[in-house]
A protein has these predicted regions:
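A conserved active-site cap/scaffold subdomain adjacent to cofactor or substrate pockets
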Residues: 236-283
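Metal-assisted phosphate- and nucleotidyl-transfer catalytic regions
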Residues: 130, 189, 273-302
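A residue-level signal for conserved active-site and pocket-lining positions in enzyme catalytic cores
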Residues: 135, 209, 332
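A short, charged helix-loop
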Residues: 170-189
Length: 337
């Protein structure tokens, strides 16, 4: 079972939602964030180094202090407000004409430590430490992590009913073309039922946000150690997550661009790749990977399927077996990073 709870969100009023919303902290660098941030953008809180001229070291204490200052200011200016009661929220994301619906909730850090929240990536200590400092200083999770849960028909029905019978609190399209909608579930019985259903779900899976999840768990452990009367119900035990049903999930492509062929012709490159991969010409229509250890490649106007040959990866190597590692490790090519 997993432990979840509704919460009092600190969020923008309707009229400021699209102005406050921003891309996640780890998909753009400081210079890009500074150029992109508008006056009310959340980037001033999640990447506060942009408020210094020149841009400051993102790991310096003044930058961490600036994040706290900005979070407080956004609330005092009315750009962020806390809801009066604890709710669950439905968050919908639309991309390329396809919408997936998730539930925003608080998850328990001890479920992460026990393995009920499953992770599939290692974390970098420096990034984990950075996010931990932000959580500790803010006493809040500014960005949610992204979890998946096994499909549940009753949860699907609850979400569908709320979406059908209520206007969204937010409804806007961001600059990248992604649509964003949010509904507040204000009915207490519905919220109680969501909690009950998730108590019967054995596991959640981290889809995105390994560093933020690990950081929240570390802060929870710190607070637990300092509290001799710890019960497990304290606010510090919980962190912000948006959970999506596995059947709706679509993982966005994470592609690599090779700037040159290192002196090879396209034909020579394909010949080299054939040493480690079964290469199939898929023509001019876009091809997406169809299975584990299968990759797509666009070269000289055509799409190719690359399937790693047996022996090019070690099933016992937790890093080497990952699809993110296989293409670079076993092409026998010097690829730019």
């Amino acid at each position: 079972m997993v432990r979840i709870k509704p919460f009092r969100a600190v969020r923008p009023p309707k009229e400021h939602a699209s102005e406050v919303a921003s891309r996640p902290y780890d998909v753009l660098n400081s210079a890009e964030a500074k150029a992109e941030a508008t006056e009310r953008s959340l980037l001033h809180i999640i990447k506060p180094e942009i408020d210094f001229d020149p841009i400051a070291d993102e790991h310096s204490q003044p930058v961490y202090d600036k994040a706290v200052e900005n979070f407080r200011r956004w609330q005092s200016e009315g750009w962020l407000r806390q809801d009066p009661e604890e709710y669950y929220y439905i968050y919908a994301q639309t991309m390329e004409g396809r919408t997936q619906y998730g539930l925003a909730m608080c998850c328990h850090f001890e479920d992460y430590l026990s393995g009920a929240i499953k992770k599939h990536e290692l974390t970098r200590p420096d990034k984990e430490e950075d996010r931990m400092i932000h959580v500790r200083n803010q006493k809040a999770n500014i960005e949610p992590v992204f979890f998946a849960y096994p499909d549940d028909a009753e949860i699907d029905a609850i979400v569908a009913d709320v979406v059908k019978n209520n206007a969204p609190e937010y409804d806007f399209t961001a600059a990248d073309g992604f649509g964003h909608q949010l509904w507040v579930i204000r009915d207490r019985k519905t919220n109680d039922r969501i909690t009950e259903i998730f108590a019967g779900i054995p596991e959640l899976y981290v889809a995105d946000g390994h560093h933020r999840t690990a950081a929240a768990a570390r802060v929870g452990q710190e607070c637990r150690a300092k509290n001799p009367n710890h019960t497990g119900c304290e606010e510090y035990c919980y962190f912000l997550a948006v959970t999506f049903p596995a059947g709706q999930l679509r993982i966005i492509d994470y592609n690599r661009v090779v700037k040159d062929l290192n002196g090879l012709t396209p034909a020579e490159l394909l010949e080299k790749l054939n040493e480690s991969f079964v290469v199939e010409d898929k023509g001019t229509e876009e091809y997406r990977p169809a299975a584990l250890h299968n990759f797509s490649m666009y070269l000289d106007g055509r799409w190719y399927s690359l399937t790693a040959r047996p022996g090019t990866y070690d099933d016992n190597d937790p890093i080497g077996v990952l699809d993110v590692t296989v293409p670079v490790s076993y092409t026998h090519l010097t690829l730019p990073t």
